[in-house]
């Protein structure tokens, strides 16, 4: 009324406008969060609601432009966001409630942290006055996840909210990418405050370096030119930096052969003549022998973890080592390097391309070719259908599909035998080795890449850790093809038990109870679970394949399901093994080729 009357007499007091404008600029923390997500370009959010985030969910309901994915478990949720981020190059965004909702993120956060995946995870928290009082669904999630996140913080004041969110996205995607956790007390999010969201941030003490020290790089290139047996080692950092094309160009200019880590698969096409194979625990004979024999190892974007080095003190014993990595902490942590270069992989490789020339590797390549011929990467011929039959079909029937694996024998076999021609085409939990990653990972990849075929490859053990995500795939109309290698065992552990534990198969037979009659005298079901019936109960398509002649037809049938997922269960001989294999405590040259 005051404003109306003042307007009539054209005498509106200034203080009234100032007070009203100030009020109009005040919004709740919940509204600011949604605004921030849009300004950061977020188009997909993976969330599971609860008491401490219900107001955020309500704000998300009111907006348009952000797709909300509702998984069936928070662990699966973060795996879906993880694979979405890996395959799109965007930041994956999660929202879960306090207490168990937050703690269910832990495995997924550790997975993303090991593999350098940019995530921003928002967790609900009880109101500030309840923190520390053992309130219902209260946990110190920032403290719990401190060692497995790149950064974590509880927002204690409403005025810090916008800046904190901006910092979270900046930290997650810059330097070595990684997961960031922001804990949001419910009362902070309800409080009114500024509607402004920062355009940029300047974080004291966090200045990620991407530029290349040219003195170090030129020193490295001189060593490369002088080497008689040079070798490139490409890790996941090459893929994260989207440097596969320029890396391939450098490889071709120098004619230096390449080995990759499992996470580096796709840094160069596996069909390229200068690609040797994966190195490490289940690397190819030629790749491991090349590392053991080279006189210069030029590593880009690797962590030199135990899966690729074998016995540390005998890794690449004849080589000088050059290491390019964006993470200072990764250099000389496990393996002493002669020339360290802290830089973004793509920037460093782009600079290399300006200077490199042919390194004269003809004799060295001939030696490597002899190793390839001596022990080609293959599997023993068996009368029953085996993994190689399935991989042959995938290579023939799918062009540039995204492959997402679980963890185990099938994972290593996939990395050995599936053709990978581009970066971010093979997705897996490489650092932490998380069972249950495969199906939700495939769902996240399919959401981010709706026009690309996505195939998950899992064992019958790992797939059951997040099998409930079939519901998510069905309701989101995702044509994910979920391949299950069913050998009725936890295969990788069984392989170790067979080779090193006297065939004492303890806790690995997934049908252990079926070895004896039930106490009620009835027979056990033939399949536990019956994956075909399970798929159908969710509304997915289920197919069981028992011989190699049925494989191609099964994949063609799956391709027809463009609006729902398909499970293809392959009945696999439990005696199938993954070779080569490095002996425990052995060097890369100590390979078991078969048993």
Regions found by a protein language model. Give the residues of each.
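Flexible, glycine/charged-enriched surface loops at secondary-structure junctions
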Residues: 177-180, 358-371, 383
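Short glycine/proline- and acidic residue-enriched helix-loop micro-motifs
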Residues: 148-151, 202-203, 369-384, 515-518
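Thiamine diphosphate
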Residues: 130, 136-137, 332-334, 340-342, ...
